[in-house]
A protein has these predicted regions:
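TPR alpha-solenoid repeat register
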Residues: 231-232, 265, 296, 352
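Canonical positions in the second alpha-helix
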Residues: 221-222, 254-255, 286-289, 313-316, ...
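Periplasmic peptidoglycan-binding/anchoring modules of Gram-negative envelope and division proteins
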Residues: 4-6, 24, 29-65, 93, ...
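Register position in tetratricopeptide repeats
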Residues: 241-242, 275-276, 306, 331-332, ...
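Periplasmic OmpA-like peptidoglycan-binding domain that tethers envelope proteins to the cell wall
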Residues: 69-173
Length: 373
């Protein structure tokens, strides 16, 4: 049974979004200086320049969307949303030209912003907002819903004065790629200045080497800097694969002190306990391993085989094709099934060949005995 690694969550490129709204007066699409000169717009402009000039950033997408509030007619709203989008985009293009930023601009319009209306209502302090939304939700026809919104806005001032004006807008959205450290940078820092790396970067550094001693050294740094259970678990996995069961169990024990209910750590601790013939502890750990990335069915099959409960082992293994599953089938004298299992082992090794020879010997297949010895 293979131990389960607890992986890093390192992402070299992380995306962040920044938005700015330009509001319009009712049934108008002309830009106002109070809107184009807002702090929100200034911040967006600065973010675009920064994303364009910083080598650790890149503009992923720049989008301008035009909207109309949902109380007007469809034709009027479509024209308003289109004009608002176009005017906002022209303004943005002029800014980009001044700032010498070259990038494409995506466009979109929403003629009747019903979704925006619902969201604004839900976030409002209006006392009857749930009732209003339930009433409007009864109308699937947009034109009928427009009429009802008009009627309600004449009754509820909050709708007319606070909700609808927020929906008469263009929205400018910048998506920026934040570009992380290169593999070479991470390897260098992991070796000489690990304090400059966050926990995910340092865990990722361990995947950049095939030297187990280097991996363990990195995991020790993760453990000392961050106290992250994954460092101990992954150290334990290396020790387990090296056959150093005592060190593996110690490492898994430390991981369990931090994350006692983690399925992968419990699974690994169970494997190590079985390797130590500590079936009582193995049963305890494997009982908490539901949801592990590891092959829990195979582990339980091995556990029951070690206990001598071959019927339970057969049930646990199911159709798993592993050497241990074949051992259980051989013990049950189900040689045809064992032969099939061994033929389907994904990574056959010397044990696979030996077990195939055992099956051949038990079924008087001399040629197969010799070819697998």
């Amino acid at each position: 049974n293979k131990a389960a690694i607890t992986p890093d969550k390192f992402q070299r490129v992380i995306q962040e979004m920044q938005e700015a709204d330009i509001k319009f007066l009712i049934q108008q699409s002309n830009l106002r200086n109070s809107e184009t000169g807002s702090q929100e717009m200034k911040d967006l402009r600065a973010a675009i320049k920064e994303a364009d000039s910083n080598e650790k950033k890149a503009i992923n997408k720049l989008e301008v969307s035009g909207y109309a509030s949902p109380e007007g007619g469809l034709d009027l709203n479509t024209k308003l949303a289109t004009d608002r989008q176009k005017n906002a985009q022209k303004f943005l293009q002029k800014q980009l030209k001044k700032d010498k930023v070259k990038t494409d601009i995506a466009s979109e319009i929403t003629a009747e912003d019903w979704a925006g209306f619902q969201a604004a209502m839900e976030n409002s302090n209006m006392q009857d907002k749930d009732l209003v939304l339930r009433v409007l939700g009864m109308y699937s026809d947009p034109e009928e819903r427009e009429t009802q919104i008009k009627n309600l806005s004449s009754v509820y001032k909050t709708i007319a004065e606070e909700i609808l004006p927020e929906l008469r807008r263009s929205r400018l959205i910048l998506t920026t790629d934040l570009i992380g450290k290169s593999d070479d940078e991470i390897k260098e820092l992991a070796k000489n200045d690990p304090a400059q790396l966050n926990v995910e970067e340092l865990l990722y550094a361990a995947t950049l080497t095939n030297d187990n001693a280097e991996k363990i050294a990195i995991y020790q740094k993760v453990a000392s800097q961050f106290g992250d259970y994954r460092a101990y678990n992954n150290m334990g996995m290396i020790y387990f694969e090296q056959g150093n069961i005592a060190e593996a169990r110690r490492a898994y024990g430390k991981a369990l002190e931090i994350a006692p209910n983690n399925a992968d750590v419990n699974y690994n601790a169970g494997l190590a306990a079985m390797a130590d013939n500590d079936l009582k502890k193995a049963e305890e750990y494997l009982g908490k391993a539901a949801g592990t990335q590891g092959n829990l069915s195979a582990a339980m099959g091995t556990f029951y085989t070690m206990k001598g409960d071959y019927k339970a082992a057969k049930s646990a293994y199911g159709n798993v094709a592993t050497n241990n599953a074949a051992v259980q089938q051989i013990l049950n004298e189900d040689y045809a099934a064992a032969r099939q299992t061994l033929a389907n082992v994904k990574e056959p090794n010397a044990t696979t060949a030996y077990l195939t020879a055992v099956v051949a010997a038990r079924t008087n297949d001399r040629d197969a005995v010799y070819s697998n010895m």
